Amino acid sequence: MQQSGRTYIAIDLKSFYASVECMERGLDPLTTNLVVADASRTEKTICLAVTPSLKAYGISGRARLFEVVERVKEVNAERRRKAGGELSEKSCDANKLAADPSREVDYLIAPPRMAKYIQISTQVYNVYLKYIAPEDIHVYSIDEVMMDVTNYLQTYRMTARELAKVMISDVLHTTGITATAG
């Protein structure tokens, strides 16, 4: 984004809490069905995060747990109808579910761990600091920043897009978390 001769990059960590929980379990955050929610509360509890593979079923990023339960039931009813009866084993993996429509859609529920999210967010911020000075990084939330990169483009001999790609690639390599930039 350019404003008054300045160039800015906004970076957002994709489904951050859910991505951290997947990475901690050795799972792919882009293909694992997982919600971050306190299941010990009622099903009215709000999910802090939902992975992209569950969002693909029309589940919002801030759904209540009962909405996830109901939507997955609907998806499985449709899969059962198309399979002509019973579904086979359950799976939380979007790739396995896509390859075998007779599998039952399942999902993991991860309890929130704010201390862990802060730790990973700090690691991500330290990646940004390898490229941008702290006074040019404006933190919006635990998973979003806006950076004024105006003074860095000539130094690095890169466009804003190239610099963003380098930083989000470094975030992925360092933490396993997918970031998007604009």
Spans of model-derived segments:
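Gly/Gly-Pro- and Ser/Thr-rich, intrinsically disordered tail segments characteristic of DNA damage-repair
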Residues: 1-181
